[in-house]
Amino acid sequence: IQIIEKRRQTYSCACCSSCCKLASSEYSFEELKQRAKNGDVFSKEFISVFVPYDSVDTAQKLYPDYVKLLREHFKDNELYFYYCPKLGSNGLCTDYENRPNICRDFPNNPLVALPLKCSYNEWKQEVEITALTLHALIDIIGYYKQKINEVL
């Protein structure tokens, strides 16, 4: 995991603002608020930054290619779209110095679907196989840990 993070640091944001204009989650805004209330740090940060689009169609009209890419990986009723209201007309954050970790760390996972123009796509392609392998190993270890605990 440290190797993946180290490689990420060799890339920098090109300020395309795609991550601010169209964020997605498998959770509705209400579900995110509930998760945040229950202590989920990611959800708390997410709802502190993003607000929901009024519909999938609105997001689709604004960013058809990215929405299409995301919808290929999720069922329609499992994906919600959001945007950051702090994005200025120049495509830059109006509160950049005070942005939360969710913004500072994006993308923190090479398994997320990134817009084609995102400068981190090259990093994603470079480390995705390693990330998938690590994810599979974690699942395998978890499975065997469960089996061992059942025997004990």
Regions found by a protein language model. Name each.
Residues I1-L152:
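Short loop/turn segments that flank or connect secondary-structure elements
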